[in-house]
């Protein structure tokens, strides 16, 4: 798809593959290509799940510091908007998304992984938000998505110290969902997202939107979001198929068309 970001589709699973060696630094071009890849997999009706992968050695080691070093306030005010928008495009993919984390996921790399629904890490993976060591703070969602995932105190520890978090600790605090041997990360991520590939695509999208949008709202608003999504699914073929199959054959045996 792009020079540094490829989209590969196999058996209804799309892989957004970062390829900017040696560390997949997230420069402006990579950011734009990530946004384009997110749009492509969102629009492709044949895609039922997405894996974000940086290769066997590294997920992404953050922003390109050389590119940022001489930036002015005015320049960064504009550039940071592009960065946030590119990651938000990933967070808004209306399908299950799994980040397959090998090696380092630091700074913008971790912030990209936070945009996924689930994170699978290799045993040797290390994640963190080291921007404070540069006299900065996270600028692509780290101060917002991280505390929503692991709580404010743990997020402040990671952001304030800039320390690297190993895979075992990341699993213990809920920062990643599964840890596997380093050589098995990509397949484990595919296996995880593959659980949803034959599911009711419209209902999965509705569930994701209801949860994600509800987290940014008060309870009453969240319940209203849920109610509208729930009611809307009664207009889908999948809901009719699922309920009919339940009555006739019992739970878990429906074959969904994604409509």
Region spans (language model):
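C-terminal alpha-helix plus adjacent terminal tail
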Residues: 1-13, 43, 162-168, 187, ...
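Crotonase-fold acyl-CoA enzyme core
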Residues: 91-204, 236, 241-244
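Charged catalytic carboxylate motif
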Residues: 29-33, 82, 89, 188, ...
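Glycine- (often His-adjacent) and acidic-residue-rich active-site loop
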Residues: 32, 46, 54-89, 105, ...
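Conserved CoA-thioester-binding segment of acyl-CoA-metabolizing enzymes
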Residues: 1-55, 88
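Terminal peptide-recognition signature
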Residues: 16, 33-34, 52, 64, ...
